[in-house]
Amino acid sequence: MHIKSIHLDGFKSYQKHTDILDFSPTFNAITGYNGSGKSNILDSICFIMGINKLDNIRAKSMHELISHGGTKAIVQVRFDNTDKRCSPFGMEHLDEIVVQRIITAQATGKGCATSYTLNGHAATNGKMQDFFRGVGLNVNNPHFLIMQGRITTVLNMKPEEILGMVEEAAGTKMYDQKKKDAEKTMFLKDAKLKEVDRIFQSSIDPRMVKFREDRKNMVEVTRLKKLKENFSRKYEAFQYFQTCEAVKKSAKEIEDAKKGIEDLGEKFNQLDLDLKNKEDEKKKMEESRDDQHEEAALSAAHLSKQSIMLQKETVKNQLVETINKLKKEGEQINKSLSKDREVLDAKRKEHEDSKAANSKDIQSQSDDEALVTKYRNDLESLTRGTIANDKGEHVSIESEIQSCKSTASQMSSGITAAKKRGERLHNQIKHLEGEKATLSARSKSDIGSADNYQKEVDEINKQLQLLGFNIDADTEKREHAAKLHESITKLKDMDTRLLNSYKDGRYALNYQRPPLHIDKFDEKRDVFGYVAHLIKMKPGCEQFAVAADIALGGVLGNVVVSTQDIARILIDGKAFTSRKTMIPVSENARNASSYNTLPDVKLRRAKEIAEKYNDTVTKMIDLIEYPDFISNTILNAVGQILVVDSLDVAREIAYDEVAKTRMITRRGDDVRTNGIMTGGYNDPGNKPALIALEPMYARRPQIEAQQRELDALNRELQLTEASSQKCRDLNNQLATAMRKLAQVKTNINNSEFGIVVRDLKVHSEEYEKNQAEIEATVKTLKDVEDKIKTLESMKNKDKNSQEKRKKELTALLQKAEQTVAQNKNRGEKARREVMLLQATVEEMEKTIKKDEGIWEQKKKECDELEEKLPNAIAALKDAELEQKAAQAKLNDLKNNQRQISTRLGKIAKECDALIREKAKTKSKREEKEKELTSLQQSEASNRKEARSKLKKFEWLSDEEAHFNKKGGLYDFEGYTVSKGKDEIKELTDKIETLERSCCIQNVSNLDTCEAKVLDIKNKRERITEDFNMLKKTIATLDKKKVDELIRAHESVNKDFGQIFNCLLPDAHASLVPPEGKTVCEGLEVKVSFGGVVKDSLHELSGGQRSLVALSLILAMLKFKPAPLYILDEVDAALDLSHTANIGMMIKTHFHHNQFIIVSLKQGMFSNADVLFQTRFADGHSTCTRLNGGDIAVLCQDKVLQAQALELTDAGKAKKDAAAKKGAQKNDKEPPKKKPIVVDDDDFE
């Protein structure tokens, strides 16, 4: 690829459009006067290749590249691409490549805008630089470009700079640049990766954690919402179930109420009957109470006995006063008593004899008086002509006969009417029996069903009797069990409310049943609750509650479970919402330790210290009560803690060498042996846990007792469950059978057959009753007729017989009266005699008894004086017993009367109670009727509510079969409306809390974010892998660079020596590393003439140095040929012969490369294939291609020769000055590396 033409417009001195055409593919020369624009053509080539260092094209800014007065500069270069061997990558199909660059001036202060086009398409600076680099034309580090002054620069180069030229020739310079760019990019990428890591750690990872927590919370919200929906369904189902149960209960209560009303009516009638019976009993007892005769007799006897007792007491007192007199009188009384006893015996015998002798007379007098009374009544009846009727009244015989005849007539009429009625009933019965026979065939099926149902009822009753199960007692037990369960639930609810209200539910045991190992877990058996639920203060120790609260501390919040397995199940199942410490009861024995109790030595020392301050020491373990299964745990917690009143005492004991133990004051100050003290308890409004939970402890025995009773009932019910179920089934069957039987009987009774049977039964009963009345009336009529006959016979007797009977009765009466008169005196005398003797005997008995009592009393009084009168006391006691006996009889009578009065009072009260009960029963019946109305309304309301629920929640009908099924979703055991509300509210609160804490957008974006984060991490890993691979590649390329550099040095050094020897025979030049260094650290030029090596290039002449520099440059060009070489007046310091030699060498050795050389010397451009001449006229430059004649004329141009000579001299002088300046600088300063300037465009 070589330049075919150049087109300039507004670039530097080429103000007008200029076309430079037909460049040679090999040697091109440009000549012209000084200032005519030769170098500007070369600058335009550098400019289009994208040079960044404007100093190399003699400009400070882009504005200076635009012609004076212009606003835009255009440079277009056409390349010939017919040689495909060196064609740029991807452009092998093009024969011509056009590159154009435009500079446009912008507003003041905004610089210039530049743009590229490649084959008519816009391109970037980086793309164009890569395009030229691809063919070996790196304008920013060029080895193909030798501008004015480059020879001098090469001569003054340091070893490092010469090495850089070799590197550029070898191609490693671009690698170094790319390496630096890559290292810079790697540095930036590494910083970016670190920044990404930092962002991940500080922002993205926490945010992703938050996103995942939000997703977890959202999953939990979804689960809780589902659970809430289930709870809501259960709540609604429970209400619907309760409503349905209430309907059933209301129906039963309505039946009970109706039955109750009937029972109350019967009770009301029974009370009325009882009230009448009580009033009759009351009347009889009042008559008995009013009899006073017996009371008077017993009262007199009691007074007599009491008088005797008083007399004996008087005798006793007299004996005490005069003991000697009593002894003498006692002897006289003893003698008198002997005589009196003899007389008494005689009188008794006389009294018995008198009774035997006079008893006949007394009885005879009584019989005679009765006979006189009888005769008088019979005579009176006979005289009047009357008889005694059934009522005992005296009526005439005639009136009695008429009364009997009237009665007989009425009876005969009644018998006739009854017979007619009987005949009529008999005819009706026969007619009904015919109808019954006719209709029985029609009702045969109903009658058979009734018989079958009756047999079924009888069979079921027989089975119930054989079963012998008391269903009423079983029902009472079940009702009692339900009441116990309800009571336990209420008590536990009270405990739950108490625990939830104390310190925001700190000791409320709320946990979820573990989803795993359900068969191994029993809540009642395996979870005992918090330690705070199991311990309490001993009675009378409540003032130490604050100290106990401080001592136990966190132990109160530990959960007591049965075994380690249960603790592991609860922990693995995440049953609690926060971390909990488990205390397995099975490990209680392992918690025992010899260090959990306070040694006696310490306790004695503590008491000694406390006594000095009049304080008392109490062991904390003695203040609390706790169950044995956590004893070692409690001992480990408070076994060595003592309680005192004073903080000073607590400190002294805690810090004492002997007593040294933990101390707590009553108000809560905690003093430890290590010097840590915790302040007192200063919030009186906040009760200690053991005081606040005291109501729960008080209710626990009641709960346990009721639970034991409930368990016993449940066990008993479970044992009888089979019988109970069988009995209930039989009762249900019996009720069904009876209902069917009643239905069949109702059908039969309502049918024609039933009506006929019912009428037949009524008529038959009436007929039988009528026949019985006829028989009774006939019998009574016969008796009446017999009585009439007797009365008529009595009426028809003659008067003579009556008179004779009257005389007989008169005589008998007179005789009886005479007998009574005769025997009256004798009987009265006998009676008086017996009574007098009886009175005498009684009086003597009394006297004897009195004397005996006196004698005994006196004797007892004497003995009492001698032996404290024991006999007198005994006699007095006897008298008292007699008095008490009499008093007892009187009291019995009075008690009897009082009992009667009490009984009357009770009867009166019972009557009042019956009256009240009657009124109460009436009131109850009215209340029952009102209750019945209310129940009916309640039933209707419940039915309406149930229908409303069913209409609102249609799923209830589908799920109703699962209601109250144990273990199912709708298990209502222990379930209440308040519990359901609490569960729903708790779930709602949890859902709201979780929804507030999580962002739905985060959850929806989580998958995208995770994918992006994963993609970023994968890219980072790939970048990291590429980064490491790049490092390895750089290390490999560094090694290859050294190898390539050595190879390039050898090749360049060989060509350098040959070219320099060719230009300057008998001279040799070489590139060698400085002393003590390697090729990779720097190179310097060594020249020898005739085998003599020059120590420095300063020893050479200016021309020789120029030849050295040119030889080196040409050696570089030969090592790595480029498609294009640009040389700007490189022959300035050479004479014509050397210039011609260089031109000939270029033409001979570089015939595959295109050279564009600016020169003023004939020796150079005479060897060129194409020569261009520049001119400057009218303020702008032009360039023309010269033919053969023009070249001959140009060779004779004196001005051009003069300028070339001036240039040669100036060049030599400039080289000498630069050489001297460089030598001085090298002597004063060590060589420095040339700074590397990297433009931002390299990274696009």
Swiss-Prot record:
<dbReference type="GO" id="GO:0000793">
    <property type="term" value="C:condensed chromosome"/>
</dbReference>
<feature type="compositionally biased region" description="Basic and acidic residues">
    <location>
        <begin position="1216"/>
        <end position="1232"/>
    </location>
</feature>
<keyword id="KW-0547">Nucleotide-binding</keyword>
<keyword id="KW-0175">Coiled coil</keyword>
<dbReference type="Pfam" id="PF06470">
    <property type="entry name" value="SMC_hinge"/>
</dbReference>
<dbReference type="GO" id="GO:0042464">
    <property type="term" value="P:dosage compensation by hypoactivation of X chromosome"/>
</dbReference>
<dbReference type="Pfam" id="PF02463">
    <property type="entry name" value="SMC_N"/>
</dbReference>
<dbReference type="GO" id="GO:0010629">
    <property type="term" value="P:negative regulation of gene expression"/>
</dbReference>
<feature type="compositionally biased region" description="Basic and acidic residues">
    <location>
        <begin position="919"/>
        <end position="932"/>
    </location>
</feature>
<comment type="subunit">
    <text>Component of the condensin I complex, which contains the mix-1/SMC2 and smc-4/SMC4 heterodimer, and three non SMC subunits that probably regulate the complex: dpy-26, capg-1 and dpy-28. Within the complex, interacts with smc-4, dpy-26, dpy-28 and capg-1. Interaction with smc-4 is required for mitotic chromosome localization. Component of the condensin II complex, which contains the mix-1/SMC2 and smc-4/SMC4 heterodimer, and three non SMC subunits, capg-2, kle-2 and hcp-6 that probably regulate the complex. Within the complex, interacts with smc-4, capg-2, kle-2 and hcp-6.</text>
</comment>
<protein>
    <recommendedName>
        <fullName>Mitotic chromosome and X-chromosome-associated protein mix-1</fullName>
    </recommendedName>
</protein>
<keyword id="KW-0067">ATP-binding</keyword>
<keyword id="KW-0469">Meiosis</keyword>
<feature type="binding site">
    <location>
        <begin position="32"/>
        <end position="39"/>
    </location>
    <ligand>
        <name>ATP</name>
    </ligand>
</feature>
<dbReference type="GO" id="GO:0000785">
    <property type="term" value="C:chromatin"/>
</dbReference>
<feature type="region of interest" description="Disordered">
    <location>
        <begin position="337"/>
        <end position="369"/>
    </location>
</feature>
<keyword id="KW-0132">Cell division</keyword>
<feature type="region of interest" description="Disordered">
    <location>
        <begin position="919"/>
        <end position="943"/>
    </location>
</feature>
<dbReference type="InterPro" id="IPR024704">
    <property type="entry name" value="SMC"/>
</dbReference>
<feature type="coiled-coil region">
    <location>
        <begin position="415"/>
        <end position="472"/>
    </location>
</feature>
<dbReference type="GO" id="GO:0007076">
    <property type="term" value="P:mitotic chromosome condensation"/>
</dbReference>
<dbReference type="GO" id="GO:0046536">
    <property type="term" value="C:dosage compensation complex"/>
</dbReference>
<dbReference type="GO" id="GO:0000796">
    <property type="term" value="C:condensin complex"/>
</dbReference>
<keyword id="KW-0498">Mitosis</keyword>
<dbReference type="InterPro" id="IPR036277">
    <property type="entry name" value="SMC_hinge_sf"/>
</dbReference>
<feature type="coiled-coil region">
    <location>
        <begin position="701"/>
        <end position="946"/>
    </location>
</feature>
<keyword id="KW-0131">Cell cycle</keyword>
<dbReference type="InterPro" id="IPR027417">
    <property type="entry name" value="P-loop_NTPase"/>
</dbReference>
<keyword id="KW-0539">Nucleus</keyword>
<feature type="coiled-coil region">
    <location>
        <begin position="247"/>
        <end position="355"/>
    </location>
</feature>
<dbReference type="GO" id="GO:0016887">
    <property type="term" value="F:ATP hydrolysis activity"/>
</dbReference>
<dbReference type="InterPro" id="IPR010935">
    <property type="entry name" value="SMC_hinge"/>
</dbReference>
<dbReference type="InterPro" id="IPR003395">
    <property type="entry name" value="RecF/RecN/SMC_N"/>
</dbReference>
<feature type="compositionally biased region" description="Polar residues">
    <location>
        <begin position="356"/>
        <end position="365"/>
    </location>
</feature>
<dbReference type="GO" id="GO:0110039">
    <property type="term" value="P:positive regulation of nematode male tail tip morphogenesis"/>
</dbReference>
<keyword id="KW-0158">Chromosome</keyword>
<dbReference type="GO" id="GO:0009792">
    <property type="term" value="P:embryo development ending in birth or egg hatching"/>
</dbReference>
<comment type="similarity">
    <text>Belongs to the SMC family. SMC2 subfamily.</text>
</comment>
<dbReference type="GO" id="GO:0000775">
    <property type="term" value="C:chromosome, centromeric region"/>
</dbReference>
<feature type="region of interest" description="Disordered">
    <location>
        <begin position="1216"/>
        <end position="1244"/>
    </location>
</feature>
<feature type="coiled-coil region">
    <location>
        <begin position="975"/>
        <end position="1037"/>
    </location>
</feature>
<dbReference type="InterPro" id="IPR027120">
    <property type="entry name" value="Smc2_ABC"/>
</dbReference>
